[in-house]
Swiss-Prot record:
Keyword set includes Glycoprotein: yes
InterPro entries, A to Z: CCR1-9-like, Chemokine_CCR6, Chemokine_rcpt, GPCR_Rhodpsn, GPCR_Rhodpsn_7TM
Gene name of the encoded protein: Ccr6
Protein name: C-C chemokine receptor type 6
Organism from which the protein derives: Mus musculus
GO MF annotations in UniProt: C-C chemokine binding; C-C chemokine receptor activity
Length: 367
């Protein structure tokens, strides 16, 4: 079997996965690609993991200690932060795998990491669609917003549970088929389709579900909702409308910049699954593109807290309170007593006052 057949065919080692490390098959040597990924991918994943954890933990801390989730957007933001945290926690395992060019962990951890990786990636994308619709209701349907959002808020947790359930269902092939096995004297954690009669069909099904729910669904929601939001803001006589429009445009552009390359590579891979006859140079270009595109896609974990939470004035205020309290805790070790009690007291009073005057249906996100 030549390199193209192995790369896009029905070989046990399924390199159609966008996060795979391309092995060296036949006359087409991808050693230079592996040398690139050994350095680039671990560094990129480590940075995404660190900054993604910091930003999303701040969001969770804000809801846990300073601000109750009172609106639909709050519930979505909290779930998205949890999703991103779980997602970035899988990246160190893949960083080690790329650096060592082998899977050094157990078979159970292989299934768990691949499954967690897929579930949280898809869940995060679906939550972006939910946030888009919530903003559409709040801004475009402003006259009906209070009634609609109040009624729907009761079911917001149910909506999030449904999103998690759908994400688990569409990611189930990842849990089922991924396993640890030996290939060319090294252990890999990849899908293996020996147990099914139509392996290419299962590959295409998995990629199709990811493309539909992980890209096209949130894209359609965002395009529809944000076009009407921009139209409404342009017509509004509001001094802050220009800033709001810039925020909307930034959200859409960041989503497109992060997700289009990754999903185009996935689409090309799906179209060419089972085909033969591609040149070695084409394989190398696709391998490079796949690794760079996935890093771009994963940047959303770092950018989501900024674009969807801390861009709002209220969240920035809570962020400053967190910083003050962290500073206070450090000072407490040196100067125990009134200083920390004073800061915590002011924070507590401020929180109570804010929650008293704030409408129960108000969102912590303000554009």
């Amino acid at each position: 079997m030549n390199s193209t057949e192995s790369y896009f065919g029905t070989d046990d080692y399924d390199n159609t996965e966008y996060y795979s490390i391309p092995p060296d098959h036949g006359p087409c040597s991808l050693e230079e690609v592996r040398n690139f990924t050994k350095v680039f991918v671990p560094i990129a994943y480590s940075l995404i993991c660190v900054f993604g954890l910091l930003g999303n933990i701040m969001v969770v801390m804000t809801f846990a200690f300073y601000k109750k989730a009172r609106s639909m957007t709050d519930v979505y933001l909290l779930n998205m932060a949890i999703t991103d945290i779980l997602f970035v926690l899988t990246l160190p395992f893949w960083a080690v795998t790329h650096a060592t060019n082998t899977w050094v962990f157990s078979d159970a951890l292989c299934k768990l990491m691949k499954g967690t990786y897929a579930v949280n990636f898809n869940c995060g994308m679906l939550l972006l669609a939910c946030i888009s619709m919530d903003r559409y209701i709040a801004i475009v349907q402003a006259t009906k917003s209070f009634r609609v959002r109040s009624r729907t808020l009761t079911h917001s947790k149910v909506i999030c549970v449904a999103v998690w359930f759908i994400s688990i269902i569409i990611s189930s092939p990842t849990f089922i088929f991924n396993k640890k096995y030996e290939l060319q004297d090294r252990d890999v954690c990849e899908p293996r389709y020996r147990s099914v009669s139509e392996p290419i069909t299962w590959k295409l099904l998995g990629m199709g579900l990811e493309l539909f729910f992980g890209f096209f669904t949130p894209l359609l929601f965002m395009v529809f909702c944000y076009l009407f939001i921009i139209k409404t803001l342009v017509q509004a006589q509001n001094s802050k409308r220009h800033r709001a429009i810039r925020v909307v445009i930034a959200v859409v552009l960041v989503f497109l910049a992060c997700q289009i390359p990754h999903n185009m590579v996935l689409l090309v891979t799906a179209v060419n699954t089972g085909k033969v006859g591609r040149s070695c140079s084409t394989e190398k270009v696709l391998a490079y593109t796949r690794n760079v595109a996935e890093v771009l896609a994963f940047l959303h974990c770092c950018l989501n807290p900024v674009l969807y939470a801390f861009i709002g004035q209220k969240f920035r205020n809570y962020f400053m309170k967190i910083m003050k309290d962290v500073w206070c805790m450090r000072r407490k070790n040196k100067m125990p007593g009134f200083l920390c009690a004073r800061v915590y007291s002011e924070s507590y009073i401020s929180r109570q006052t804010s929650e008293t005057v704030e409408n129960d249906n108000a969102s912590s996100f303000t554009m």
